[in-house]
């Protein structure tokens, strides 16, 4: 009986008239889902997915439309309509975000667009096949070569030419912000040798004599021009063509024209690989990968 009395005393000392005292200690799992959603809104998308594994409340909040709408571009409807040709109805915002964070092709697969998973900024890439390149149809000058070093699985390679000119344009509903435009180039032709990356630079010539000129224009009068000598061989480099500011007044769609030229016909140029033109939010440009 003494043992039973002792056990009863211990049970009473660890409980109260309201039940086990541990039940009275609030935890993260006791927070209302609406409150958790407010907390989760302040996290970036990667962190939201991690916190969704904590408990049921965080898992439920991680599916809330209000949370994911705050992570989508302000004009996400326009962006989706541009990519898909229409807006997908009856989809949760989380699914819309998941779709946009993947790389999506449009315009006959010559353009790809996605949103940065940390900042939700819109990024866009235009393949060499989506650009106007002088002499591209003459195989004496240019050829398209397959490669796994491009998002588009091929690049334009220049053997030799006197008049070098590349032009392009993009008409896209970029959200309000500042964007940087880059040409992704490499001096040399990369390939594989016994499974290892190699880059043949034997045909590289003419780029260290006169600089290449980059230009860009917008419909609202913005203009940028810069010159650069191409000197580094064997690596993909993003050459900055300029920046564009997208304002509230033209947020429905922004048309950007750009060019890269070296038209001094006193010498030939050759051995250049042209992959793409990329448009990144200026705040994300440090994330550009270099091969």
Swiss-Prot record:
SMART domains: FBOX. One of its GO terms (molecular function) is carbohydrate binding. SUPFAM superfamilies: F-box domain. It comes from the Eukaryota. Pfam families: F-box, PP2. Residues 25-71 form the F-box domain. PANTHER family: F-BOX PROTEIN PP2-A12, F-BOX PROTEIN PP2-A15. This is F-box protein PP2-A12. It comes from Arabidopsis thaliana.
């Amino acid at each position: 009986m003494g043992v039973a009395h002792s056990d009863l005393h211990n049970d009473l000392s660890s409980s109260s008239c309201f039940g086990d005292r541990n039940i009275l200690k609030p935890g993260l799992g006791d927070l209302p889902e609406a409150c958790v959603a407010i907390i989760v809104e302040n996290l970036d998308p990667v962190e939201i997915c991690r916190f969704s594994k904590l408990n049921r409340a965080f898992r439920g909040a991680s599916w809330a439309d209000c949370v994911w709408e705050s992570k989508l571009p302000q004009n996400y409807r326009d962006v989706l309509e541009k990519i898909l040709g229409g807006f997908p109805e009856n989809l949760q915002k989380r699914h819309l975000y998941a779709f946009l964070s993947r790389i999506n092709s449009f315009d006959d697969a010559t353009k790809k667009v996605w949103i940065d998973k940390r900042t939700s900024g819109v990024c866009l890439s235009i393949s060499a096949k989506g650009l106007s390149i002088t002499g591209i149809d003459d195989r004496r000058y240019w050829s398209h070569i397959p490669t796994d070093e491009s998002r588009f699985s091929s690049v334009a390679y220049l053997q030799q030419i006197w008049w070098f000119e590349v032009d392009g344009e993009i008409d896209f509903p970029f959200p309000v912000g500042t964007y940087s435009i880059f040409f992704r180039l490499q001096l040399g032709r990369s390939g594989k040798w016994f499974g290892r990356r190699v880059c043949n630079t034997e045909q590289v010539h003419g780029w260290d004599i006169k600089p290449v000129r980059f230009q860009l224009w917008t419909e609202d009068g913005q203009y940028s021009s810069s010159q650069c000598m191409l000197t580094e061989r064997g690596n993909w480099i993003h050459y900055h063509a300029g920046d564009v500011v997208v304002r509230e007044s033209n947020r429905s769609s922004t048309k950007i024209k750009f060019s890269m030229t070296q038209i001094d016909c006193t010498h030939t140029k050759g051995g250049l690989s042209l992959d793409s033109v990329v448009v990144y939010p200026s705040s994300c440009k440090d994330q550009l990968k270099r091969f």
